[in-house]
Amino acid sequence: MCTELSKRYEYRRAFSEVRLLEAMRYVRLEDGVNYNFITAGDVDSTSYLKVVLNQHDLDYLLISTWVMSAEDAFQIFEWYNTGCIRKIDMYFGDIYPNQYKMEWKMIREFYEQHPEAGRVAVFSNHAKIFAGYCEVDSFWFSCQLSCNANTNPRTEQACLQVNRGPCEFYIEYFDGINSFKFDRYG
C-alpha cells in the first residue's frame, strides 16, 4: 500500500513542481520582494523550497510543519547529503510521532546519524514555514504556507519573502521552542 501511495504522490508532486517551476523559471528571487501564490492543491511546501534551491544553496534551513511525508523528508535529507543545505532545524506538530510513525523514525534516524545537521523538535505546532539563508549570496528568505510538506487536494496559498527581517524573526522564535520529545541539537 505504501508503494501505491508513493507512486500517486510522485505524479501529483511532479505535476505541481512543473507548474510552479515554470511560473518561476525566469524570475530571479530579489531582496525585498514578496512572491504570492495560490494553487489548486497540487503543490506542497517542499515545492517552494525547490524554487529557492534552484537559485541558492543554503547555509541554514528552518522547517516548521504539522506533518511531512517520507518522500519530502527523503528529498530534504538528499539535499543535505549533497551539500545544498548545510544545517536543518525541523519543527513538527504534536501528532506527528504517533500518527506518522515510519516518517518519524526516518527523521529521528537521520538526526542520530548526523548530529551536526541541526535540531528536530515536536510541540503544539501547526505553523507551515520555511526560513533560511545563504550568507555568501546575502540571501535570506522565509515562506509562509497553508500547506504541509505533503500534497493534498485543497486550494492552498503561500508567500515567499526575500528579506532578512522575517527570516531572523522566525529563527529567533523557533530557537526558543521546548520540544515534547526527541529534542536533538547539533
What spans do the regions from the language model cover?
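PLD/PLD-like phosphodiesterase catalytic module centered on the HKD motif
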Residues: 1-186
